[in-house]
């Protein structure tokens, strides 16, 4: 019973739910996932909807994050589940500015174009009973602006 009622960051990222918050944190901060066999940059760890770079005989043992100068995460949550319909993490660190988007598509994504303020296209975004792809594309822009404002704070 105790295991069923508790979650971990490692378990959440290994599951890679496309609407989960942690993947955006890892990608947006440029984290490294440590496993029983290797270290995987977060940009390479999340490979598709509910898929990761983990081998069948590997588990997540730790996650290492560089400390950002500034960062903020904003999400538009599903009111029932609190999962992100769209979540955007913005960070500024030694490696520059990074933007990660979760909930909008089948997998968390490093959004290099968002850094430049390019409008997000709805092609390839999720469309379901919670939000259309077009609405999610608009939400990415809105959440990005809010995250930038919060990080600049």
Model-derived segments and spans:
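C-terminal structural segment of proteins
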Residues: 1-153
